[in-house]
Amino acid sequence: MEFTVSGTTVRFDERTMQFAFTRDGAEWNTCADFKPTLQCAQGTFAFADATSITHEQRETGTGTGICSIFTGFGHSAYSFETYVWVERASGDVLFEWIPLNEQGLNITNVTWPAAMDFDCADDHDTTLITHEQGVMIPNTWPTAVSTKDITFDGRFETAGGYMPWFAQLRADGHGYIAICETPWNAGYGIDHPSNGPYTHINTWFEPSLGTMNYRRVVRYQFLDHADHTAVCKAYRSYVNERGRLRTLAEKAARNPSVRDLIGRSWVHIGIKTKVQPDSYYYDKDHPEKNESL
């Protein structure tokens, strides 16, 4: 399947379920060896393990996309839909994961959409994550980085991902920002081996109160002539368009003490920890670890 909307071309291989996107003369492909999965109490299933998979192109007044329905995993009737479409107004690509029938599986994690192919051994090819004060990882960086190295496994709106986005920038100025529009039960996974030559990053979703129960959405905006500043401006513009931007001046008007924080250092360090015996984090085998100063 192939279509073009507002300057963005999408190609979809129904056999491998890989996507390719072209915009501003740059092509982006999902990783060939990345398998989107459902992790659940009953085991782990790749999307491709579904007993029934259907694909159809869908066109609406807001855009054009590919709707896929996956049904039957193991001995269950569990089913879900993915909808990957281009927004006509912006040319952005939206990835939507939608539960249809949640009977038969107890989902703990959904890994989708797939990471982008970002495998050039160039120290100007970089990945941006909003971990703590922000991290830029060149593809040739000597230190390995995995999801377990990130605070709270990269959960959005925590120290692992204060803002719900990540980005990748190529040496030639092409890049993308992936914005999670439903960040409440979501985060990112990352894989960067020592010295590269690649960095793979993707979104994960988890259930809310035991079920997936609502649509999950990630927006990919492809950029040209981009650097880390352009990425941040793109996110700022996205938030502002939706009426959610709060500038530092506005925050200071509401709370004047904000002005006292300008120019101050921010240090991530614990001062005192006391874990209560009824807490999930209480260590019964090593009680001395439950208190520190």
Set out the residue ranges of the language-model regions.
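Carbohydrate-recognition beta-sandwich/jelly-roll modules
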Residues: 2-293
